[in-house]
Amino acid sequence: THTVYSGGFWKDMGVAVPDYPHDAPWVWQVFEGDCPSWVHSVLDNFDDWLHYGIVTVNKLMPGRFIAPHVDTLYKMRQKVKREEMNTKGMVPVRVNLFLQDRLMGHYIEIENESWLDYKKGDYTIIRPNLVHSVANLGYEPRFTMQLTGFAKEEDIT
């Protein structure tokens, strides 16, 4: 997925799209049914509070990044509409699950806060409208899993 336009973030901010190198803002993604079976088993570990979950595995190669953006949760919103899901009393959330210990050059920032000491299995919750970015300035691929669904506010605070 090419992320240079950051889902319209630059346009919403009223600024020009930065002049990034063309091949820098790319992330490899595997969605839902194309993910290996173990990915869906991981999702099961969150089903006591994450409802209607869908999964994505991301691979960010060295020298690549995902510029500041706000998640639109497009695939999740499509699923809710298509399957007429009852999400009353819940908010959309994205769980960013780290599939490896942090390595040199692996970077995540959410609302101006960086997380530099995560371990494999740690996760963070990305709420709607939170500006965040990731980068791989290291020498090995960076792997994460996204679990996107709906949760009750009291379950994620």
Whereabouts are the PLM-identified features?
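Short, flexible loop/turn elements at secondary-structure junctions
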Residues: 59-61, 72, 97-103, 128-130, ...
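Extracellular structured ligand-interaction cores
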Residues: 52-55, 63-65, 92-96, 131, ...
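A short hydrophobic beta-strand segment most commonly corresponding to one strand
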Residues: 93-98, 123-125, 139-156
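A short beta-strand-loop-beta hairpin characteristic of the jelly-roll/cupin
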Residues: 90-119
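Conserved metal-binding segment of the jelly-roll/cupin
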Residues: 116-132
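Conserved short histidine dyad/triad with adjacent acidic residue
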Residues: 57-90
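Non-heme Fe(II)/2-oxoglutarate
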Residues: 1-57, 65
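A short secondary-structure junction signal
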Residues: 67-71, 78-80, 106-112, 136-137, ...
